[in-house]
């Protein structure tokens, strides 16, 4: 297994080199979105609305960070269960999304969409929100502030630790004997 240090803006060209189980340290911009935000983003796409961020080449982190503590840029920001977003993911990938960060397995439809769009799914460490927060350098709420911790946030991250859970060929860390 390999180790990669990748800026999100260069992720698209790096995806074919990454395999299931590879360690990746991401830097750059990611956006948080959970269930409620995904529903709103879906409605915007379906109704021709303006999205709060461009999906082309974007990476969404399935997380609802807590407010920052004194002297820290953000509170805890661990991953949430990704399967809750599966109903929305193919549509978002059809509109340019290439990467997702979360925890747990994905549906066959999401795996097919990852293969179709040469995308990738990363797994972050569940239960380690404080560890994940160490890689966040700054954040801002950019959409749906009424959703509180589930609002869409723009995070600037540095060496955010993830593992490739599903690669662009559709191989999944959740398949028996995959790694």
Over which residues does each language-model region extend?
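Feature captures the catalytic cores and cofactor-binding loops of soluble hydro-lyases/lyases
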Residues: 32-33, 37-160
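Short, surface-exposed secondary-structure edge patches
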Residues: 12-17, 52
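Short, charged beta-turn/beta-strand-edge "cap" motif at the junction between a beta-strand
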Residues: 11-12, 23, 29-33, 168
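A short acidic, often aromatic-flanked loop/helix-cap motif at beta-alpha or helix-coil junctions
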Residues: 11-14, 147-151, 171
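Short, structured beta-strand/loop micro-motifs enriched in basic residues and often containing a Trp
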Residues: 1-10
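Active-site/ligand-binding-proximal alpha/beta "capping" segment
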Residues: 88-89, 163-179
């Amino acid at each position: 297994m390999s180790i990669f240090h990748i800026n999100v803006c260069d992720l698209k060209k790096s995806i074919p080199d990454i395999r299931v189980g590879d360690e990746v340290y991401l830097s750059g911009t990611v956006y948080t979105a959970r269930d409620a935000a995904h529903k709103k983003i879906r409605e915007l796409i379906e109704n021709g609305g303006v999205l709060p961020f461009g999906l082309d080449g974007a990476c969404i982190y399935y997380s609802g960070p807590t407010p920052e503590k004194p002297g820290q840029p953000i509170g805890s920001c661990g991953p949430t269960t990704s399967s809750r977003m599966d109903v929305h993911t193919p549509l978002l990938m059809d509109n340019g999304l290439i990467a997702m960060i979360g925890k747990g397995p994905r549906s066959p439809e999401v795996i097919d969409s990852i293969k179709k769009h040469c995308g990738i799914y990363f797994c972050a460490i569940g239960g380690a929100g404080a560890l994940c927060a160490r890689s966040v350098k700054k954040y801002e709420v950019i959409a749906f502030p009424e959703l509180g911790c589930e609002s869409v946030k723009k995070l600037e991250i540095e060496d955010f630790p993830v593992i490739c859970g599903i690669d662009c060929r559709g191989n999944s860390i959740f398949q028996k004997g995959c790694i």
